[in-house]
């Protein structure tokens, strides 16, 4: 198969998972390449996502690595053979690749959850709120790119508002609800928008109030996307150098535990809706 100039995060993740299976089997690159009937350079390209692969290649590698997890193997085959063109591809070359990657990640997710402290989660944002966030940067974005980013963010909502919505849970700190991105009416509209979403059966919204005692989780913001199998889960976290993608099993398990801890101290869904409703009236 032809080399890819810029593999997507999903394509690179497939290669990473195959590399992990190889390493777990204790095989060197040249040994795995020999089992596949190719060379080390080609295997390196497969593991970096630079070249694609067929179902047969994935299954031969899994067999060489003595992987007996049929669900994982089937999921990897699906990643390798999926040729669906997603809505986000129309933004190729117009927006940073990270925008396309998160849309593709969400498209294939089995469920999503967010923990946010400063801003309303992207899947809950109104158009005006998103425009306000993207406008507040230096140097300012050209108008065309600003509108492209807003449009992309609105289209991401399809995973919770479209014909096949996925389960979504949002833990939102009171600070994110109170910060005015825009004027008073825009903030009220944003809070109302959250309330409308929270009425859906597949969506759960919880508020983390200011008045919690002994709360040390303000650093726990994350976006989490469940894979077809837990080993293919992915978490995104903001760092000083940008957004970091996390996919190691140990780190993902730690983040799931952290999410449960924050969820435990959050208000329940009904109290959260009441809280947001009162806040909207106070503004």
Describe every region a protein language model picked out.
Residues 164, 171, 181-283:
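C-terminal regulatory/effector modules of DNA-binding transcriptional regulators
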Residues 2-16, 20, 24, 29-34, ...:
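Interdomain hinge/linker segments and adjacent boundary elements that couple functional modules
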């Amino acid at each position: 198969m032809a080399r890819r100039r810029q593999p997507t995060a999903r394509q690179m993740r497939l290669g990473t998972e195959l590399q992990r299976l190889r390493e777990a089997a204790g095989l060197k690159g040249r040994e795995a390449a020999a089992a596949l009937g190719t060379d080390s350079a080609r295997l390196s390209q497969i593991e970096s996502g630079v070249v694609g692969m067929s179902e047969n290649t994935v299954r031969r590698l899994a067999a060489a690595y003595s992987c007996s997890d049929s669900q994982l193997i089937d999921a990897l085959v699906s990643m390798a053979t999926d040729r669906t063109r997603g809505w986000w591809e129309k933004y190729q070359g117009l927006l940073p690749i990270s925008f396309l990657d998160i849309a593709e990640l969400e498209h294939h997710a089995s469920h999503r959850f967010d923990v946010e402290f400063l801003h309303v989660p992207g899947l809950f944002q109104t158009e005006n709120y998103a425009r306000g966030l993207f406008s507040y940067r230096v140097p300012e974005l050209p108008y065309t790119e600003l509108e492209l980013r807003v449009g992309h963010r609105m289209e991401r909502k399809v995973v919770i508002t479209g014909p096949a919505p996925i389960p979504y849970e949002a833990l939102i700190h009171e600070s994110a609800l109170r910060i005015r991105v825009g004027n008073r009416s825009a903030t009220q509209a944003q809070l109302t928008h959250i309330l409308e979403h929270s009425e859906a059966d597949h969506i759960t919204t919880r508020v983390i109030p200011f008045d919690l005692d002994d709360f040390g989780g303000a650093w726990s913001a994350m976006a989490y996307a469940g894979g077809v199998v837990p080993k293919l889960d992915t978490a995104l976290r903001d760092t000083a150098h940008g957004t970091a993608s996390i996919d190691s099993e140990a780190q993902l398990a730690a983040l799931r535990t952290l999410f449960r801890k924050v969820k435990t101290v959050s208000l329940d869904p009904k109290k959260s809706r009441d809280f947001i409703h009162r806040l909207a009236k106070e503004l």
